[in-house]
Design a protein with these regions (language model features):
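Acidic/polar, glycine-enriched structural segments that form the non-catalytic walls/loops
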Residues: 1-172
Length: 172
């Protein structure tokens, strides 16, 4: 997930933390522009990790404990990624012991670094292309003029029950 923040010169300043109500083991710093939170969902259950990175133009990005800080930037891009052991083979997960959460965080960080190497505009264009492939498959055209618009809804429904048509009823 990518979030682009922009404001007048030097006005983007944010402090971001990853948090979860319960069932997390660790939070901290991965590097000078990435923080993480990791944990598990109980004994012998899925383990997970999530990371948040930032890149800024005209400002500073740094970590302070488990907080990611952007100060005095013209714009900033936040990159969020998460992963769990759900999609990995049990043998792979077993080979990561006792560092499962760290390995997940490393995998996420690699993906975030690849995303950060690209310009925001390119990421947005790719997202819009992917989105269109899923959501531009259906079109809905509603009538411009409605002959029955002044009629009460119950009368319009009764006309349909009686075999009539009312294309504008879909707008309701």
């Amino acid at each position: 997930m990518v979030l682009h923040l922009r404001a007048p010169k030097g006005k983007v300043s944010v402090e971001v933390m990853l948090n979860r109500a319960k069932y997390f083991d660790r939070t901290g710093k991965v590097n000078d522009h990435t923080i993480y939170l990791s944990g598990n969902l109980g004994k012998n259950a899925l383990e997970f990790a999530m990371c948040l990175s930032a890149k800024a133009k005209g400002g500073r990005v740094y970590t302070m404990g488990h907080t990611l800080v952007v100060k005095g930037a013209d714009e900033a891009v936040l990159y969020f990624g998460a992963d769990s052991t759900f999609r990995y083979a049990s043998a792979d997960v077993a080979s990561w012991e006792p560092r499962v959460q760290e390995v997940l965080a490393e995998k996420i960080t690699e993906k975030l670094e690849r995303a950060m190497a690209r310009e925001y505009g390119g990421l947005l264009a790719e997202h819009e292309k992917d989105y269109r492939e899923f959501y531009d498959r259906v079109a809905l055209s509603l009538p411009e003029k409605e002959e029955n618009a002044a009629l009460p809804t119950d009368e319009r429904l009764q006309r349909i029950i009686s075999g009539g048509t009312d294309e504008g009823l879909a707008k309701l």
